């Protein structure tokens, strides 16, 4: 379970977080967020096409695996409303994530939001025919006639699946293709594929306490024109647990941060090779927190060093 977040609120966010806690229930959170005089979320160009992509999205591992639980689905619908109201669009899933794909598809249909979403999912199986069958099932679950980004999950049988993804991209069934891994231990293979193959995206782990991607993967992505999606920006939740209850340093206000979660997300987004970050959440108040990291200034190199130092203080 993700630990509670420590937030230093300003008036707009105080109202929203009180609403999220159930203190005031006069309107949906997403409606109030949309009504605030808040700038739109930053976008960054997808290197292979120049298409602008909002910098903060939503991961669905565990958090969207709620099956037919209507109460949980209603909460997740509010999460997505907040994402869209803030100008976000990226939703990342996988057939590995239980019912997450099906729940995402149901919610996008309920919200009439398929056109607002940039839907990313993955193929995670061995063999060409099995890969095709799995991707077709993902499209059915997501209720998407076309997938924006199809990724090879954890590099599983990547040569076979990449050939299929190229065919699907050429035929218009997917718009972009890529590879993913969740641990820096796989970076040697990730790097080799990035050097040998033409990719639109790579999805990797990167956080203020796990900066291995800075050594080779992020510079190579910039060199090769590959978009970068970041998973586990909170170190799998361990960073939030470590920082829980600790007051924000004064320098956080310099980049408009009112929570440690925003500081950690802005640390990741400050790297110029990063295209988008996809923190997973199933709670509306956390999505409000996350999307604010896509607004305002990012830390410079000196401030990034202070963020890293704060983790070991």
Positions of predicted regions on the chain:
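Generic structural signal for well-ordered alpha-helices
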Residues: 43, 80, 101, 105, ...
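Short amphipathic alpha-helices and their capping/turn segments at secondary-structure boundaries
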Residues: 40-51, 136, 215-223
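Structured C-terminal cap/extension of enzyme domains
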Residues: 26, 216-313
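Short hydrophobic/aromatic-enriched beta-strand-loop microsegments
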Residues: 116-118, 199-204, 297-303
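A cross-domain feature marking catalytic cores of carbohydrate-active enzymes
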Residues: 57-60, 93-95, 121-123, 151-154, ...
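Glycine/proline-rich, positively charged
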Residues: 67, 126-212, 216, 223-229, ...
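Conserved, mostly hydrophobic/aromatic
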Residues: 46, 58, 91, 104, ...
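N-terminal binding-site loop/beta-alpha segment at the start of enzyme catalytic domains
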Residues: 2-117
């Amino acid at each position: 379970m993700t630990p509670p977040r420590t937030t230093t609120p300003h008036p707009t966010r105080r109202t929203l977080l009180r609403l999220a806690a159930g203190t005031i229930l006069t309107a949906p959170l997403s409606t109030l967020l949309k009504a605030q005089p808040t700038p739109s979320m930053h976008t960054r160009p997808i290197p292979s096409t120049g298409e602008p992509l909002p910098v903060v999205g939503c991961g669905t591992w565990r958090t969207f695996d709620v099956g037919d639980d209507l109460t949980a689905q209603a909460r997740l619908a509010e999460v997505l409303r907040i994402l869209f109201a803030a100008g976000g669009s990226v939703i990342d899933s996988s057939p590995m994530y239980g019912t997450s794909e099906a729940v995402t598809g149901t919610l996008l249909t309920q919200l009439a939001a398929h056109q607002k979403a940039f839907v990313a999912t993955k193929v995670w199986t061995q063999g060409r025919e099995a890969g095709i069958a799995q991707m077709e099932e993902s499209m059915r679950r997501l209720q998407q006639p076309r997938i924006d980004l199809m990724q090879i999950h954890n590099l599983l049988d990547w040569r076979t699946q990449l050939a299929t993804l190229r065919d699907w991209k050429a035929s218009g069934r997917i718009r972009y293709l890529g590879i993913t891994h969740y641990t820096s231990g796989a970076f040697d293979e990730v790097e080799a594929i990035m050097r040998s193959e033409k990719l639109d995206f790579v999805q990797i782990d990167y956080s203020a306490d796990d900066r291995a991607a800075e050594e080779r993967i992020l510079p190579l992505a910039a060199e090769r024109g590959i978009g970068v999606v970041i998973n586990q920006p909170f170190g799998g939740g361990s960073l939030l647990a470590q920082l829980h209850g600790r007051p924000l340093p004064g320098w956080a206000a310099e980049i408009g941060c009112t929570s440690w979660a925003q500081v950690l997300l802005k640390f990741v987004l400050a790297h110029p090779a990063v295209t988008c970050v996809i923190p997973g959440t199933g709670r509306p108040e956390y999505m409000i927190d996350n999307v604010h990291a896509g607004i305002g200034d990012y830390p410079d190199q000196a401030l990034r060093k202070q963020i890293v130092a704060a983790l070991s203080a």
